[in-house]
């Protein structure tokens, strides 16, 4: 189970089907076979807090201008009724320019969900391209070499 994914499953208990949240899986020492599964029964739960993965879509304008896109957060903590828990939260980053950041406050939560993370927290950044310092160092070395040669 990848980190941050909220898996809802149906489990039969005493002949009754219940919606459960898969909380944890323990695997055997070879890592292939599950030996224990923790479920959280959501039958009588109105709302639950879960981490949901973020899916970034689009190419940021800043990347097209030579910048680098860097995701900072990969999940968001949301509070929602079990039936409204999304598999992922899709975030369009095509509007991010050079040197701009996307914050939690900029994300519209899915219907019925509330994002619990700090609104000021940075979700992703488009860094400006780094200036090439290598060319300047080579120029400086050439000048030094010329000075030594004439001495």
From Swiss-Prot:
Biological process GO terms, please? translation
Lineage top rank: taxon: Bacteria
InterPro entries assigned to the protein according to its UniProt record, in alphabetical order:
Ribosomal_bL25/Gln-tRNA_synth (IPR011035), Ribosomal_bL25_b-dom (IPR020057), Ribosomal_bL25_C (IPR037121), Ribosomal_bL25_long (IPR001021), Ribosomal_L25_dom (IPR029751), Ribosomal_uL5_bac-type (IPR020930)
Q: Name one GO molecular function term.
A: structural constituent of ribosome
Q: Name one GO cellular component term.
A: cytosolic large ribosomal subunit
Using the UniProt annotation, give all residue ranges assigned to the region (Disordered).
131-151
Function recorded in the entry: Not known. A homolog of ribosomal protein bL25, it is missing the N-terminal domain which binds 5S rRNA. In vitro does not bind 5S rRNA.
Q: Tell me what this protein is called.
A: General stress protein CTC
Please report the organism this UniProt entry assigns to the protein. Answer: Aquifex aeolicus (strain VF5)
- Lineage of this protein's species? Bacteria, Pseudomonadati, Aquificota, Aquificia, Aquificales
């Amino acid at each position: 189970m990848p980190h941050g994914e909220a898996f809802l499953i149906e489990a039969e208990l005493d002949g009754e089907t219940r919606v459960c949240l898969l909380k944890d899986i323990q695997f055997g020492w070879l890592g292939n076979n599950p030996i224990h599964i923790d479920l959280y029964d959501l039958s009588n739960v109105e709302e639950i807090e879960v981490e949901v993965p973020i899916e970034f879509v689009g190419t940021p304008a800043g990347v097209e201008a030579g910048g680098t896109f860097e995701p900072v957060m990969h999940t968001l903590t949301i509070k929602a009724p079990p039936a409204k828990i999304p598999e992922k939260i899709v975030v369009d980053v095509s509007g991010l320019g050079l040197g701009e950041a996307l914050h939690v406050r900029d994300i519209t939560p899915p219907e019925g969900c509330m994002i619990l993370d700090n609104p000021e927290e940075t979700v992703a950044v488009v860094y400006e391209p780094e200036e090439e310092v290598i060319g300047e160092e080579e120029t400086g070395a050439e000048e030094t070499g010329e000075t030594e040669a004439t001495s």
